[in-house]
Amino acid sequence: MFPNSKVELPKSTPVRRIGLSVQYEGSNFCGWQRQPQAVSVQQVLEEAISQLDPQRPIQAVAAGRTDAGVHAAGQVVHFDCCGPIPAERWAPALNGRLPNTIRVREAVARPASWHACHSATYRRYRYTIYNGRRPNLFLTPWSWHRYHVRLDETVMQVALEGLLGLQDLSAFQRTGSRRAHARTTVQDVKIERQGDLIMIEIQASGFLYGMVRLLMGQLVALGEHRLNLQTFERRWKEKRRQEVKEAAPAQGLCLLRAGYEEDIFSKGGWYDCQPRYSLGANDPPLDPPSAPESS
C-alpha cells in the first residue's frame, strides 16, 4: 500500500509532525541514541520511516534517551514527514517494517510546536526486581534477580520518599553527562511487592545520566540491610558520588511513559508493562536480612 520507491509530491507539500507511542525490548540495542558501531532503536526506527517517506532526511526525537539494554513500554517519539500517509496509518505501516523487538502502539498528528522531549512534563520509569529463590527464565530479560535475602521494601520506600521534590542528585549521575546541572524534580515514587516481584517506580521532570540504575543499586543495598538510611541520605545530600558504586543491571529498567500537558494518545496507546509469568509462588521464603551495619 505504501511503496518503498520515492513518491513525487508537489513542491508545496507541507511538512507534518507525527507523534508515536513506541515500545521496545532493549536487550539487543545499544540504547535509543544512534551509535557509530552498534545498532540503536533510533537508527532502526529512522530507517523504517525513511522507507515510507524518502523525500527528506528523517530524525526521530525521543522523550527519553534510554541506555543499552533498557526497555520502553511508552516511549514517545516525533518526526517530521511530507509524504501522503495519514497519521493514523503510520503505526501499521511501520510495524510491517520493524523487527519484533520494536512496536509502534499509536501514531497521531501533532503541531510543529510540539516536541517529544522538550514538551514533556515528566518521565516515569519502573525497575523490576525478582526476589525469588529459584531462577525464572521468563523473568530474566525484564528483571534483576536478587535472591540472597528477602528485600525489606519498607525501608526502601522510606528512602525513596526522601527524594521527593526539587533535588540535586549529583550522587546518582554517571560520569560523561553533558547536563549543566544535576537538579531535577522528583514528582512521585512507588514501591510494590507482588509475591517475589518488587516493582519500583519513580517519576520526575527529568532524569540524570545513569540515575535510576545507580539509585536502584543503593536501594537494594538498603533492602538487604547492607546500608542504613543515614548513610544513604548522607551520600546523596552531600553529593558523595564516589561512594555510590553499584549500578543495577539494565534489563530491570523500563521507561513506562512520558507525560504532557494534554493527553496525546488514547488510553490504549500506553501499556503498563507488568510481567505476568509464574512467579514461583510455592518457593520457600527467603531469610530476612540482618541488621544494617552502622557507620
Swiss-Prot record:
Database matches in InterPro entries: PsdUridine_synth_cat_dom_sf, PsdUridine_synth_TruA, PsdUridine_synth_TruA_a/b_dom, PsdUridine_synth_TruA_C, TruA/RsuA/RluB/E/F_N
Catalytic activity: uridine(38/39/40) in tRNA = pseudouridine(38/39/40) in tRNA
UniProt KW Chaperone keyword: no
Pfam families documented for this protein: PseudoU_synth_1 (PF01416)
Keyword Transmembrane attached: no
EC number of the protein: 5.4.99.12
GO biological process: tRNA pseudouridine synthesis
Xref: Gene3D superfamilies: Pseudouridine synthase I, catalytic domain, C-terminal subdomain (3.30.70.660), Pseudouridine synthase I, catalytic domain, N-terminal subdomain (3.30.70.580)
Family annotation (HAMAP family): TruA
Complex and partners: Homodimer.
Task of the protein: Formation of pseudouridine at positions 38, 39 and 40 in the anticodon stem and loop of transfer RNAs.
Protein name, UniProt field: tRNA pseudouridine synthase A
Source organism of this protein record: Prochlorococcus marinus (strain MIT 9303)
Gene: truA
